[in-house]
Amino acid sequence: MRALLFDPYCGASGDMILGALIDLGADLEYVRSAVESVGCRLEVNERRFDHIRAIRVKVISDKSFRSLGGAIDILKASALTSRALERALRILDIMASAESKVHGVDRENARFHEMGSLDALADIAGSCAAMESLDVKRILSIAPSVGGGITDTSHGMLPVPAPATLEILRSHRIPWRGGPVAHELLTPTGAAILAASVDTFLDHHPEIVTERVGYGAGSREIGMPNLLRAILGEIPHHMQHDRVVQIETNVDDVTGEILGSLIDMLMKEGALDVTVVPAVMKKGRSGSVISIISRENDARKLSAVLMRETGSLGVRVFPALHRLIAERRIESVEVMGRSVPVKIGSIGGEIISVKPEHDVCRRIAEELNIPVKDIIRIASEKGWRIAGRKID
């Protein structure tokens, strides 16, 4: 599978991402037209950092904007295709949501701390055009470095990571690390592009057969090569993998009603899966083994919920389990005038599973007063037809 891997060992900004993608071989004519269509001019230059060649892009514009609505209008009028535009609007939405949350204002009045001019918007449009032109099936990233210290923004002096950047990392559950220097390395624009584009964040480099390597140069002097590395290549196996934590505890004094509500609560708090298995405890007592699959950064929170709700005095945590998972995507099918999400699973282009969202099927069945199994059957049949047309 053709994949793009970002390696933000020195963070990421919009211009660094754009430069790295151009260096990888993105269609420069399409990228330039995307940037120019939002009212900017693109300069592409080659630079060297300690004998490492990199692409430094500079976006030139004397126009400015502040409102979300204005930015949306500019993007919609741009030269981006519908696919690239969808990603660009998603990036903008992520940034607006973060600024709104941090500053306590509504989204339309959110003030983008990087966007005194159109530079960041041009970086977004150019990066989306570049990623589309590279035509990859999967985008991965190593956990980004954010830097440290204090940074000067249009909101004043702020700690690193900047509040908007940190909110993006939090809301999208992106793992990150501090350092390696006391500068702002990961900007809100860079974080938002990664959040909207990356399918999986990793702690270390995956198994990949490298085709090309690109370097995007940052504008600041930070005492080390200020570069973002991007790798284009083939992932030799088609199952994805990630790192999860397994949390367990045994209980013998918890009712079925409490266990049912506990499962719902854990899933709402971010658990990936929860199972309850009947067991025979010491002294022949009947009980249950509660097992939770969790992301690493959610383990402490979910352990606290488990202990608080069951009264358990301790839990077992099995860290850093490697989970192999099939590729998954969500498509929508129409059933009797209603939209039903269908999860399609595949390995190496071979479809292995098509499952309609049960809760949606049940709701439609109740509205139309027909058996839920009929809704599931119709949605499944349509899902398989869609899946067959879209095999890579």
UniProtKB/Swiss-Prot annotation:
It holds the Pfam family Ni_insertion. GO terms for molecular function: lyase activity; nickel cation binding. Keywords: Nickel. PANTHER family: NICKEL INSERTION PROTEIN-RELATED, PYRIDINIUM-3,5-BISTHIOCARBOXYLIC ACID MONONUCLEOTIDE NICKEL INSERTION PROTEIN. Belongs to the LarC family. HAMAP family: LarC (MF_01074). This is Putative nickel insertion protein. The lineage of its organism: Archaea, Methanobacteriati, Methanobacteriota, Stenosarchaea group, Methanomicrobia.
